[in-house]
Amino acid sequence: MADKLVKATAKNGDVRIIAAITTDMVNEGVKTHKCAPTAAAALGRMLTAGVLMGAQLKAESDSITLKINGGGIAKSVTVTSYSDAHVKGYIANPNADLPVNSQGKLDVGGIIGKNGNLLVIRDMGLKEPYVGQVPIYTGEIGDDIAYYYVNSEQTPSAVGLGVLVDKDLSIKASGGFIIQMMPGADDLVADLITYRLQEIPSITDLIAKGMSVEDILEFIFEDMDLKILDEGIVPEYRCDCSRDRVEKALISIGMKDLKEIYDDGKQEEVVCNFCNKKYVFTNDEVGSLIKRLENNK
C-alpha cells in the first residue's frame, strides 16, 4: 500500500488522530544508512514518529527534531521533520543489532537502552526553539513518545509505531499513529480506544495485508464517528543539505579551527549525517572561508 499521512477526528472531535503508512519513506532512510535489521527498525520508528509529529506543525518553515539516546549500542538516533511530511534522520551506529526479544520481535529497546533521554526540539522561527526532554521510558520509541506527550505537553496519547524488516533487509511494512484525547473528553472513550488497540493486530500486520491508512482508521474507530479531515500527503525521506549550508557550518567552527585545517595544507571533506553526501573543500577554498570570516569581523 502506498505511503500516505492523514489527519482525522473521532467521537465528535474529542479524539485527534494522525496516522501514516511510511514503508517507502523508511525504506529510503534505511537504504541510505545501510542499517542492520534492529537498527533499521529503530530508525524507521523514529522517522515515522518524526513525520507524525511534524504534521502537527503550523508553518511551512517550522521543524521538529527528535533525538533519543539511552546508552545502548545504537548510540543515538536523530530525525528532523517538517510540516510538509518530509523527514531526514540517522542512527549513530547503523550496524546495531541484537537477537529477537522474548516476543520474537526485533529488540529496539535493547539497542536503544533506557539510561538516557528523549529530546524534542520544536523550531518555530522564534528567537529560541522550544525544547522538551523526558527520561526514556522503555526505549521502544512509541512508548517514549507517548510518555513525552503526557509529561511535557500534558496530552494523554496512544502512540503506535511499527517497522517490519524483510529477509533481504528491505522494509516490508512501516507505519504509525498518534491518537490524542482532547480536554474534556470522556474517560470511557479513552478506555474503549485502549481496549481496541490491545485487541487488534499490529499496524505492520494491517499494512502488510494491504490495508490503506484510511482502512486502518476505519477498523480502529468503527462506530466512533471517524472523520478524515484531509486528502492526505505523501511522507518522503529527503535531505535538504547543500554546499552553502556546509560552508556556513565550517565557518561556525571558528577562526582557530579553520586555520588549523588550512595550515595542514590538505583538503577538508565533510559528510552529511543525514544522507552521507560528501562535500570536499580544497585548501584554497578553506582559505577563502577564513578571509570571509575576517571580513565579517
From Swiss-Prot:
Keywords: Chaperone, Cytoplasm, Disulfide bond, Redox-active center, Zinc. It is found in: Cytoplasm. CDD domains: Hsp33. It comes from the Bacteria. InterPro entries: Heat_shock_Hsp33, Heat_shock_Hsp33_C, Heat_shock_Hsp33_N. Its main location: cytoplasm. Gene3D superfamilies: Hsp33 domain, HSP33 redox switch-like. GO terms for cellular component: cytoplasm. Disulfide bonds join C239-C241, C272-C275. One of its GO terms (biological process) is protein refolding. Redox regulated molecular chaperone. Protects both thermally unfolding and oxidatively damaged proteins from irreversible aggregation. Plays an important role in the bacterial defense system toward oxidative stress. NCBIfam families: PRK00114.1 (NF001033). HAMAP family: HslO. Belongs to the HSP33 family. This is 33 kDa chaperonin.
